[in-house]
Amino acid sequence: MTHILVVDNHGQFTHLEHRLLRDMDGVTVDLTDNTTPPADIDADGLVLSGGPTMADIGHCREYLTLDVPILGVCLGHQLIADELGGRIEAGDYGGYADVTVSISDADDPLVGSLAPDTRVWASHADEVVAVPDGFTITAESDICGVEAMGDTDRDLYGVQWHPEVAHTEEGEAVFENFVAICE
């Protein structure tokens, strides 16, 4: 069994990330608060959930030093970029949106299977505008230039959209692909 730990950054959809992973075959999943000490983290992979603000991310920056694959969703995606030398800024489009995302790297282990494009649900005010060294932009849209990014050498991935919500057409595939990375 692959054990995934969902780190709660107090986002509105965190429970959906947990539920989606819980319902997958071959996966055990736990939900933990972002104040859990890094030394207490024991998992095959981490999902850094979305959340309202970078001011309340607990130990998430420290989790990036753990030797496990990590998937950042929305705020989690942004904090990976911010901590590792990328840049985030206020986006031109804030709020909720049904967005068509173009997959720019069909070989990417996280989002490549969604190529050439997919419809997703976005809910964010800030966005990644420059990826850290070692990362590749793997998806983009008309409203956000870095919808997804990945560093396959370090198994660090991020998506700006919310794959856990029903409005995202192939969201479950993102989590299935992440579990495969963690195996």
From Swiss-Prot:
It is an enzyme of class 6 (ligase). Transmembrane segments: none annotated. The active site is at C74 (nucleophile), H162, E164. It holds the Pfam family GATase. Residues 3-183 form the Glutamine amidotransferase type-1 domain. Its EC number is 6.3.5.2. It catalyses: XMP + L-glutamine + ATP + H2O = GMP + L-glutamate + AMP + diphosphate + 2 H(+). Signal peptide: none annotated. Coiled coil: none annotated. Pathway: Purine metabolism; GMP biosynthesis; GMP from XMP (L-Gln route): step 1/1. It comes from the Archaea. Keywords: ATP-binding, Glutamine amidotransferase, GMP biosynthesis, Ligase, Nucleotide-binding, Purine biosynthesis. One of its GO terms (molecular function) is GMP synthase (glutamine-hydrolyzing) activity. PANTHER family: GMP SYNTHASE [GLUTAMINE-HYDROLYZING], GMP SYNTHASE-RELATED. Catalyzes the synthesis of GMP from XMP. Heterodimer composed of a glutamine amidotransferase subunit (A) and a GMP-binding subunit (B). This is GMP synthase [glutamine-hydrolyzing] subunit A. The lineage of its organism: Archaea, Methanobacteriati, Methanobacteriota, Stenosarchaea group, Halobacteria. The gene is guaAA.
